[in-house]
């Protein structure tokens, strides 16, 4: 299969709105994509080829444009780069797909099955994490970070990591790692994409106004919410 780069010197003929056909080099269209957001570029392509003739040709470029990156914070206050895809045209839980292969420290080093795409929904991997994440059992569980979550200081958590014989990034249980993904990371992405308020209000929640005001619209707030989750190791 030809890559986008090998196609760029070719000329593609769009089926346009008028009887007059316009010839546009793929290289020019690729150049235009640098100045448009993913959603805007997709609208541009659909306007040029309303019958969908160009879908296959530009799929590679559209996939590339849907990828974003940002620095997220874990419970230990360390930053980690998160790569994700955001596309509202996918079905509900697949709006946001996260590159889990770049988050091995948070996953305790466990690898996804080889046949799995590196971009996955956290909801599809929840059972996988519950079965396989075991860093909270390190050294018989004496380093578990879930203890005293409301009172643990950052220095206490760092001290536990300093004495870890396996150099683990953290010692949180699967419940807290899943809470980090579902409560903090997904909300942080929705806030960055500018759709958080809309989704909360469309959900018709009785406390929608409460959730869309003040500190509840910040990533820091949802990091605290996730960290305070109760689990069987919490006190």
From Swiss-Prot:
Record region (Repeat element): 57-235
Misc note: The genome of this virus consists of at least 28 closed circular superhelical DNA segments; three of them contain homologous DNA sequences that code for one or several tandem-repeated element proteins.
Protein name, per record: Repeat element protein
Organism in which the protein naturally occurs: Campoletis sonorensis ichnovirus (CsIV)
């Amino acid at each position: 299969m030809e890559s986008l780069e090998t196609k760029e010197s070719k000329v593609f003929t769009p089926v346009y709105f008028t009887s007059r056909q316009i010839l546009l080099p793929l290289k020019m269209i690729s150049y235009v994509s640098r100045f448009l957001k993913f959603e805007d570029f997709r609208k541009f392509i659909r306007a040029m080829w309303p019958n969908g003739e160009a879908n296959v040709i530009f799929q590679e470029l559209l996939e590339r444009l849907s990828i974003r990156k940002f620095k997220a914070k874990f419970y230990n206050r360390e930053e980690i780069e998160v790569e994700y895809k955001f596309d509202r045209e996918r079905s509900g839980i697949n709006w946001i797909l996260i590159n889990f292969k770049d988050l091995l420290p948070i996953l305790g080093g466990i690898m996804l099955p080889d046949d799995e795409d590196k971009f996955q929904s956290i909801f599809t991997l929840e059972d996988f994490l519950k079965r396989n994440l075991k860093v909270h059992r390190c050294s018989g569980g004496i380093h578990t970070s879930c203890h005293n979550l409301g009172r643990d200081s950052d220095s206490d958590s760092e001290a536990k990591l300093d004495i870890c014989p396996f150099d683990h990034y953290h010692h949180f249980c699967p419940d807290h790692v899943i809470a980090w993904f579902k409560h903090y990371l997904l909300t942080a992405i929705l806030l960055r994409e500018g759709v958080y308020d809309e989704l909360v209000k469309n959900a018709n929640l009785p406390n929608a106004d409460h959730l869309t005001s003040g500190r509840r619209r910040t990533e820091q707030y949802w990091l605290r919410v996730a960290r305070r989750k109760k689990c069987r190791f919490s006190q």
